[in-house]
Amino acid sequence: MKSIKRAAAFILAAFTALTFTACKGKTTVNDDGTKTVQTEKGVKITETAAKAVQTEKYETADFSITIPKGWVVTTGGANIYHTIRVSDPNEPLNCMFILLKAECLLHSYAGKEAWQSNYSMGNTQAALFANAPVLENPSTENFFKIFTQYGDFITQMDTTYSGYTFPRYDNFTVTERFASNSNLKSYALGEELLRATFTDNGKQGEGLFAASVVDFGKYAISSGKLVGYQLQTVDGGYYMAYNVVAITAVKDTFIEWESVLTECMKTLDYSDSFVNATNQASNEKVALAKQISQNFNQTMDAFMSSWESRNKSQDIMSQKQSDATLGYERVYDTETGEIYKATNGFTDVYDGKRYAPVTDDNMYTQAISGYIEKQ
């Protein structure tokens, strides 16, 4: 009889332990790769995509870079015009973008009209300039404001971009500016590092942006107009943009993705064969191809320091507004310090002690680790 009681007690204890374990640690892997963990009875936490991300090395004959696992890498252009886009197939706004050089950003609309007139009269060599976008006030900001136009233009005019899709930065709006430390600063016009918002296919994104706009010089071209029997000319010259870099994410999630994207971008390394081929094909006066890695490393260092010194009140306000719009409140784990978004009312029904409401505004400047719910 005693042995039966002991066996029953053992079975009951084992069942209790299994039940306890199931309630406090059950993990489910979701279709998107994130994990949902049950931390307490009735409490579930689903990690963010940024928290769940794993990385892997991507390598070609031209370059190598560490990327978030599962992201898609596309390339276009040749030599100094080479571009790389690394994007999340589930959310293309989550993206890393590099373009070594953008060319033919016309000085004025008068110059564009002159090139168009020249082209219409049969000068097929004028086609590139006749279709080029205009950058009237040269600066990093204004370059990105016309970047969508540039992407459409160069894709149409340069077959080396065939099959490549440039990101779109429509409605580009600067929210914060930082001083540039690039080695092109003495040549560049209106150069800054920018934090900005934008839209792509109607969806709002946010990110950090850099580019060095350099003047190639004026070029007198006939406007086709006669004044006193003298043919008039206009400025048909253009600007170029070097070291065009952007890291972006869906607005209000960039705070979660920034460190992931920056750390990945820091690993970009162009091969010696690519640099040598670019050197041979280029005749650059202010941005020698051999400086590619140096220029890029400077940009990434500047991104990191700029993000650390950003105006965090902007994040606090934006994150609070996003929570109010989407119906969230924030709580934090008193044991780990991790921060979570919870649907409104979570703290009304949660009677435990581990998760407490966020009362420190500085917590809104930190990335959340996931979403918490009480069942």
Describe each model-derived feature in a short phrase.
Residues 30-32, 74-244, 249, 297-301, ...:
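Conserved polar/disulfide-associated segments of primarily extracytoplasmic proteins
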Residues 267-325:
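Pro/Ala/Gly-rich low-complexity, hydrophilic intrinsically disordered segments
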Residues 30-57:
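N-terminal low-complexity, Pro/Thr/Ser-rich intrinsically disordered segments
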Residues 71, 243-287, 371-372:
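Surface-exposed amphipathic alpha-helical segments
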Residues 19-22:
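C-terminal motif of bacterial Sec signal peptides marking the signal peptidase cleavage site
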Residues 60-78, 265-272:
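Proline-anchored loop/turn motifs at beta-strand termini and strand-loop-strand connectors
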Residues 24-26:
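Bacterial signal peptide processing site
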Residues 1-11:
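Bacterial N-terminal signal peptides that target proteins for export
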